[in-house]
């Protein structure tokens, strides 16, 4: 919990307006040449855009020089990280087997990038506490440089790949649902900040995006940003007659739970309209919908990610 408190300040609601301004500029900048192309490869575009947003907002950094290296290393690293839940797999990490060797190379590369980001910030002598990296660097006497590096790596890994995947799935679902796509386009056309070509506040973005929000909620139901949450039982317990001993590895799957027909009628159908009633989510039992996790380990960047995704959806719907 102490670690969580240390990481909370950059994600407070009071910072969201400044983040939305940065996001707005970066989405404009990143998508300006899309009009000249017949088609684009959306997944890598979303990866690059969300990396730019996280880098600029949380690290005060232009990420262009690292985009390709991070993308290549992330693909290898995430595959291995997702297999962490397989007991005993870590014994093979230093085995020299090709798969594990590739992970070691990718991991080392990401560490080098994180260290370069930190060094560049220190050399710039701009160690202000107006973003996450600045806050961490001002605590250098209390936490080690290795700790700071690990936090930067965690945010690079968790702060852009998850959002990029959700966006790719959202646009995929929209491409197959012209009625919902038209609703989103109408919402973008009606947004005053888009009409006036200006940056919205966080509240203005939230108020102008009920359709975009429903699209995101339904997309995260069927294609959650994290599909499984590994946990370790802290005490002996019994669930539905099954005894779970203290120390047991327990896997809780968003992907499976979000498809439970008891909570979501026609669970395999992508239907944003189910979220149109504001009371629908409130009526769901605790733990039936948790795209950002839950409890004391719930994702700190939830509102940051939702603002980013709403903005991308509306701006792309308006311009393309």
Model-derived regions, located:
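Conserved cytochrome P450 K-helix/beta-meander segment immediately N-terminal to the heme-binding cysteine loop
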Residues: 134, 252-281
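Cytochrome P450 heme-thiolate monooxygenase catalytic core
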Residues: 2, 15-166, 183, 188, ...
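Cytochrome P450 catalytic-core helices
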Residues: 50, 162-187, 302-319
